Structure formats: C-alpha cells, structure tokens
Amino acid sequence: MDTMLNRILAHKRIEVERQRIKTPYDQMRTRAETAPPPRDFGAALRAHHPIALIAEVKKASPSKGVLIENFDPLALARTYASNGAAAISVLTDVRFFQGHLKYIEGIRALFDRGAAPPLPLLRKDFMIDPYQIVEARAYGADAVLLIVAALDDETLAALLALAGDLGMQALVEVHNADELRRALAVGARIIGVNNRDLHSFTTTLETTRHLAALLPSENRPLLVSESGIFTADHVALVRSWGVDAVLVGEALVTAPDIAGKVRELGGRL
C-alpha cells in the first residue's frame, strides 16, 4: 500500500545509508559514548503536575506544509524551557518535516551553556536503524521516538535496548491495540499514543481514550498523548483518561503568543 508512512520509510532507508557512508558507525558510536551524559526524560515527565508538556520544535509537516515562516529553533527552545515545558521534542527529518539534527545539537549547546533551563531532548524521527540511535546520542539527544508501525518486533526490541545501553529512554509510539500490545511486550516504559493515523493522517483524540483503558494497572508505563491537542480543554480531557504528558507542536508554533500557549497547555496559567 502506497501510504505517506511507507514513502517516508523508503526515503529514510536511503538517507540512513548516505549518513553511514559520510560518518561510519564506529566513528558515530565513539561520539555517542563520549557525549555529555543524557538527561532523564521520564523523570522530567513525572516531575510535572498536573500534566507534563513535551513542546515540539517543528517547522513543517507533510499534511500542513510550513507552519512557521520565521523559524528559529533556538528561540523556540528557549521560550519552551522558560515557560514550563517538561521536555522538548525536536523533529530531525529533513525531507518531509524540514527538521535537522543540527537543531538538537544547537539546543543542547544552548542548555549546556546555561542560556535556558536545561530540559531533556527527544529526537523525533522515523527511527529504523541502530545507526540513527547512536547518531541521536552523538548529537545530544536524551530520548528517541520509536514508531511501532514502522518496525518489526525484533528491530523494535533491538533499538529500544540500544537506546538504553547509551543511557537514553524511548518514547514508543502506538496507534492501535495491537501496536500497544507489541510495545508492552518489548518492555516499553513510556508509551506515546499518536492520535493521528500515520497511513491516512486523520486525527481523533478518541484513540488516546481507547488505548489508555488497555494499559495495565500494575507497573503502568508513562502515557503520552500526541497530535490533535490544541487547547487547555483538550489537555484536561486526555488527562481525565489517565494521560501523564502531552506532546504538542503545531498548536505552539502557530500560536500568536507562543509563551502563553506553552503555559496554557502545560497547566501553568
């Protein structure tokens, strides 16, 4: 089936091979292992009450095109960090989302020199290869996104384990009950429910309600709701379903007052 996800993944395989030729795995692994230690993504989410906001550095999307014309990733990160976000998601896909790994590198440097409150950084991309996990750590990421729909069980488990070996955590993204089952089976401790279907790109918050009810009550993983969240009412709704954090991009970067929107969605108003 020719879907947007399949097109993205086909290009991603080519992109990863190009990067591997440019910087071999062993060289990237050395960079990853000598990078400053990662910050604790999960602890940052748990520390924010009543709900944690993962604020996204996002310039564009395949469905909406460019969202913010005067895109300044460092300024966005500084605004997010200064107004109560718990963590920052950084889109690094170049072709479809106009992101870049250098944004993580720049934001990490901003935090390390004390120019803004230091928050954990999530590399948000279509991760399909161990090289990308190592690359994420080398550039300063503290966590990575793993999309269950894009991975078989063996690869999902391997990428999750590699992230852990490098001191990172993973936001394991699901969209239906079968994907949730698979995520739990490999030991995912942070589950992200994407309210947007990555095949059709339609969005409904009901996806979060449905999957939240399927989480185990004992040793329950952190639950993050992603996509389709634009207002404080949306945040309150998903929180009532047991959500621990929300990941928001479009609503922030398109807001007339970004700082105010961060405070609104993070429950800081």
Curated annotation (Swiss-Prot):
<dbReference type="GO" id="GO:0004640">
    <property type="term" value="F:phosphoribosylanthranilate isomerase activity"/>
</dbReference>
<dbReference type="GO" id="GO:0004425">
    <property type="term" value="F:indole-3-glycerol-phosphate synthase activity"/>
</dbReference>
<dbReference type="GO" id="GO:0000162">
    <property type="term" value="P:L-tryptophan biosynthetic process"/>
</dbReference>
<dbReference type="InterPro" id="IPR001468">
    <property type="entry name" value="Indole-3-GlycerolPSynthase_CS"/>
</dbReference>
<comment type="pathway">
    <text>Amino-acid biosynthesis; L-tryptophan biosynthesis; L-tryptophan from chorismate: step 4/5.</text>
</comment>
<dbReference type="InterPro" id="IPR013785">
    <property type="entry name" value="Aldolase_TIM"/>
</dbReference>
<comment type="similarity">
    <text>Belongs to the TrpC family.</text>
</comment>
<keyword id="KW-0822">Tryptophan biosynthesis</keyword>
<keyword id="KW-0028">Amino-acid biosynthesis</keyword>
<dbReference type="InterPro" id="IPR013798">
    <property type="entry name" value="Indole-3-glycerol_P_synth_dom"/>
</dbReference>
<keyword id="KW-0210">Decarboxylase</keyword>
<dbReference type="InterPro" id="IPR045186">
    <property type="entry name" value="Indole-3-glycerol_P_synth"/>
</dbReference>
<keyword id="KW-0456">Lyase</keyword>
<protein>
    <recommendedName>
        <fullName>Indole-3-glycerol phosphate synthase</fullName>
        <ecNumber>4.1.1.48</ecNumber>
    </recommendedName>
</protein>
<keyword id="KW-0057">Aromatic amino acid biosynthesis</keyword>
<dbReference type="InterPro" id="IPR011060">
    <property type="entry name" value="RibuloseP-bd_barrel"/>
</dbReference>
<dbReference type="Pfam" id="PF00218">
    <property type="entry name" value="IGPS"/>
</dbReference>
